Amino acid sequence: MQPFIHLHVHSQYSILDGQASIPALVDKAIRDGMKGLALTDHGNMFGIKEFFNLVKKKNGATKDAIKGVQKRIEAIESGAEEVEDKEKELASLQEEKAKLEAKIFKPIFGCEMYVARRRLTDKEATPREIRTTVVNEVEGFSIRRGAVDEGGYHLVVLAKNLKGYHNLVKLVSKGWTDGFYSRPRTDKYELEKYHEGLIVCSACLGGEIPRRILTGDIQGAEEAILWFKNIFGEDYYLELQRHKATVPRANHETYPLQQVVNDRLIEFSRKHGIKLVCTNDVHFVEEENAEAHDRLICLSTGKDLDDPNRMLYTKQEWLKTQQEMNDIFSDVPEALSNTLEILDKVEFYSIDHPPLMPTFPIPENFGTEEEYRKKFTEELLYCKLI
């Protein structure tokens, strides 16, 4: 079995779309022996601090044990602790340390961003001639081109180090403050500006590459791939998904479209030397949670459960085990193992920091902040007393 981790995961912080709690996601990933997990909520990073704190707590005992082993290693090497067979003891301790380090669970901080088709500041009402829907038939299914500024293309963006985390925060924040139009959006100009320390995956059928493929714009898809490769280099991956619906009341159109996209992505991967990864676009934890998630989608779209025309998911979007993902992608094992390559690229880093307190200038005649505070405290106290 190829080792695997999930890189495309939505929690309850993907508001009215994700149904999974962060503790449940992390607990299942750890139980299954996964070495890490990414959190990529839609357009936001609301859950990142909870995710960080939870994983930090779960890793606490193991990290303390590693520190204890390291202290013994240093003591033996320096001669502070004498042992009968120094080399044998050090080798044993190094082995113990390696086993402990292998137990550390790595959080990957990310976001499934929306990338504007033009600039993030473009928010005009779309002209009628552009707004008119164009339909393309692909493998018997209708693919629609939407309004030019509507929502944006999906893109999975992961921070591989602290610099990347800061850049991701900038991109997401700017998407809300400057790029919001139906959704918080970034654009390619911003991605190029803040690309350092980021890993990017091409996302689901809502991504630019899949959409271009499904509308017959193969040249445009290839040009977009080469743009991302030029900016992100070895940190750009083409993302495969396979959601074959197995129950009647589910979206059965998605899987054939994914297969069309996957075939092209594999072709582009070989042609341009871009690595593949597989994901499951996780929205809930267990298979049996699909019905609860279905009802959540009814709430978010304002539709009745028995509406024949309402939005449906494939009901395959649970946090699948490594074995389940191996069964689905057995023909492309590199797409499984490359998820571990991304995990190895991601550094351990802390997003904790001390409180950021405001700084107020103190008039020179008061000297110190303490003297300034004392003067006004006494004055206000006196006023209260009289």
Task: Please state what every model-predicted region is.
Residues 1-386:
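Phosphodiester-processing cores and adjacent nucleic acid-binding clamps
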